[in-house]
Amino acid sequence: MLRDALGPALIGVYLHGSAALGDYDPARSDIDILAVCAAPLGTEELARLGARLGRDALPCPADAGLEFSLITVAAARDPAAAPPFELHGWDEHGRVLPGEGRGDPDLPRHFAVVRQTGLVIHGPPATDILRDVPLDEQIALVTDELDWAVGNASRSTQVLTACRAWGLSVDGRYRSKRDGAEWAVERGAPALVAEVLADHRAARESHPDAGAVAAFVASVRTRLQHK
């Protein structure tokens, strides 16, 4: 559909996240797509393309929906903390909306993830298009992600997010939630992590102890601060 809509202006399309890392579950995962176009699109073109990508027009197999960003080649190489985007969605109403000059602070983390683990749907390797994000910047970004999880996500997600951040800080690798927890268990993480991992593998709801979660997250955050 993107090739049909953009033609030669479509430079690259990349699948990332759980679907690229082997931990995809349609009941709880979203589908993460990063697309790159040659130049900014006009207002009418953005509106038409956004409508074609919305939930009503493009049913998504993942219950959690679509995480989609369209950026220009210039934005893909932009060292800013929040590079500008052409389109982003889905929002809470299943819409894909134009950026209108706004930036997205999640994009540099997506650049790093896509460069390392993304799957090419269309175009050249992601390393040819997306800027290389230094590891210290990546660690700062996953620290922000962990802080967001503490305030907004379930306790089990906090644990899994902490495991992934810990792994990245040690060896620079991005992992799925499952692989991050397995890595942490192998390195002597508290029993809490093995319990959350077992529930994750079985697709069960997990209700770890709040105090144990807070202590584990704090310990990982301390590791991140000293990197």
Briefly describe each language-model feature range.
Residues M1-Y14, E44-L46, K227:
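Helical scaffold of the NTase/Pol beta-like nucleotidyltransferase catalytic core
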Residues P105-K227:
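Conserved nucleotidyltransferase catalytic core and NTase-mimicking acidic/glycine-rich helix/loop elements
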Residues A20, A75, R164-G167:
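Short, solvent-exposed loop/turn segments at secondary-structure junctions
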